[in-house]
């Protein structure tokens, strides 16, 4: 009994000593009471500004709040307290002092065990991340077996126009496998004609031997760059940000393209971002519909009043069935499907942020759609002509003059961008601008009108809207998705969740219900759930020749897995569910 009382008294005294001599930490968010979502995400803290060239802080498991003062060496802290205690005692520690340090040693053992558990969890997350990172980097390239082909416009058969935008026209195209196929296509008169007008068989199906069009060729409109390849590449370099290394291996007239230190960044591949397979300059051809659709953009030898130059840039990409706007005009996805579509956009934006690139022109017209074998849509972000991909400024653009370009889409321009004022030390931070645009596009995905489009009283402007003016989403939308969309559209960027945190929230709401149902989120339970998800995802990926949308999303989640970020998302979800 005496020993028990001594140990109990020692624990009380040890705790009092720790509270007295340990450094007082600032407000931190971890396993304690959930803080605001501001700056939550990949290694961020509320109010923290990350410099453009800074490496991301290694993220480990945060200790519970009651252990935060053990950030310095445990051994060093123990020695410091012991020295101060011995100085005060001036004669050595008696039985009471020995009990204090015995209790203190027991406490250190518990904390070291907690730290070891956190290290094991962080290590498990890193191993899972390494496995799936390699898998998600694989982006199919239909031209990978033709490394030295496809760098001339003459290598392609051009079909019908797919669409046109503010600065380019897009046509379907194919590359004949063998030279005799090219001759056959020319003989049948298929050059310049799409599948709607090709020869049909007796049963109404497409005739054998008729080419299909797996590629889309984007022909840029060259009004101000001149006709030299150097000037064209310099003026339109942002279009080359999502280009692969092989895509830029061709000759550009008399010029070989070389990425310069002052040029834009090269974007690493991602399943939710367009990939440019080939890029080259060539003479402007008179393509189908050109005189009717964009005569003013043609060279004068095609149209006397045309403003275009005789040479321009061509980009070869995958041909997708439709844009997101076209898809939503025909179909209204279910709430679960709409959640997964929003999640895909967040995954793409998070990848851009990690690479230090801002798209700045996100809208449903610039998002392409294809379907998996189950009919679920897969979204791809395209059109990087307005992107910010500067190697020197990162996501913080110096705004020292009103002539500095803010971006391309004024309607979906984040408040911190649209309200920025130029000045000698002014800077526009784009780190959460694309995330805000995803929140606005989410209204369209869930079947509602985009509140930042249109006219009348329902129309909002990013410069002046208040969060209370945002339209309420219907009850059919999952509550987590409703809360997240409103959170993405907060005016203050510091209160807005990062794309990574938002993506983790949707991942957990879709597939982590078992984890969220736990009263206390324990590390061993979380790691067991992650291992189970990893095994199931690997098995699903191996069993199917082409992964479905859900499997792809789970692979992306595991490829970006970080223990602390996952805990933050779980805490945010728990706080939303606990709120009235």
Curated annotation (Swiss-Prot):
Cytoplasmic membrane side: 111-580
Record-listed ATP binding positions: 162-170, 186
Record carries keyword Transmembrane helix: yes
InterPro entries assigned: Kinase-like_dom_sf (IPR011009), MitoQC_Scaffold_Kinases (IPR051511), PINK1_STKc (IPR040110), Prot_kinase_dom (IPR000719), Protein_kinase_ATP_BS (IPR017441), Ser/Thr_kinase_AS (IPR008271)
Ranges of the Mitochondrial intermembrane topological domain: 78-93
Keyword Cytoplasm: yes
Transmembrane segments: 94-110
Subunit: Upon mitochondrial depolarization, it forms a supercomplex with TOM and TIM23 complexes. PINK1-TOM-TIM23 supercomplex formation requires PINK1 interaction with TOMM20 and TOMM70 and is critical for PINK1 stabilization at the outer mitochondrial membrane, kinase activation and downstream mitophagy. Upon mitochondrial depolarization, interacts with TIMM23; the interaction is required for PINK1 accumulation at the outer mitochondrial membrane, kinase activation by autophosphorylation and PRKN recruitement to mitochondria. Interacts with PRKN. Interacts with FBXO7.
UniProt name for this protein: Serine/threonine-protein kinase PINK1, mitochondrial
